[in-house]
């Protein structure tokens, strides 16, 4: 065999090995991309479940209309989610909760199971659980306002939540907690209506969720080869 032929064979083998590695990396990245899309969808489902729970005790026409729209969006997203990687059983439980919007604890159990499913695939559990604490504060304050004030049991739940969230360094969260404590939690008669409670804290919840989504997208891009990164 001539030197030229040997060099040609060696180059062909090296090229084949390189192309195989590129194909493997490309496939792995496609799989990772699909899983990130599924996680992002789960975070949207989490947001909608928390909203549906927070709207569940409200009877105002605008709140009922928004709750119906949230329920329709949830049903559609869960149908789409079933075709994505890492499916879960949220859709089956949601079918029952859709008809019982005031079932606060039922929503909370479903949300906890969704957060656990997310945490199994990506280390987002702590951020999602803190987000859920804030969303639960919103929902319980709506409930307290709707029923004309806190029962001792409800006040104890809210006080425990506020204490747990009190360690959060977010100044805006502390301000909102103070307003809810004065206006609902420790007030003999609520000074904030259910829609006001819901509207007060929803922007903070949405902002925190966006932060989790952006972190997930950023982390997924860090593993990309330069040629695969957008821009």
How would you label these PLM feature ranges?
Residues 2-231:
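Hydrophobic alpha-helical segments
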């Amino acid at each position: 065999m001539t030197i030229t032929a040997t060099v040609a064979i060696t180059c062909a083998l090296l090229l084949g090995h390189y192309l195989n590695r590129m194909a493997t990396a490309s496939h792995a990245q496609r799989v990772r991309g699909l899983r990130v899309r599924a996680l992002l969808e789960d975070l949207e489902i989490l947001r909608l479940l928390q909203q549906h729970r927070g709207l569940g005790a409200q009877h105002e026409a605008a709140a009922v209309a928004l709750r119906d729209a949230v329920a329709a969006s949830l049903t559609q997203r869960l149908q789409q989610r079933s075709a994505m990687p890492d499916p879960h059983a949220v859709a089956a439980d949601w079918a029952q909760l859709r008809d019982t919007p005031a079932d606060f604890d039922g929503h909370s159990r479903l949300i906890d199971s969704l957060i656990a499913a997310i945490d199994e695939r990506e280390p987002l559990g702590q951020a999602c659980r803190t987000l859920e604490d804030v969303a639960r504060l919103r929902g319980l304050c709506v409930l307290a306002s709707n029923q004309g004030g806190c029962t001792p049991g409800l006040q104890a739940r809210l006080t425990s939540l506020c204490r747990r969230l009190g360690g959060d360094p977010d100044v805006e969260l502390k301000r909102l907690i103070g307003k809810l404590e004065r206006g609902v939690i420790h007030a003999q008669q609520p000074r904030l209506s259910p829609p006001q409670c819901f509207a007060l804290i929803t922007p903070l919840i949405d902002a925190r969720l966006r932060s989790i989504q952006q972190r997930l997208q950023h982390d997924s891009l860090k593993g990309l080869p330069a040629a695969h990164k957008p821009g």
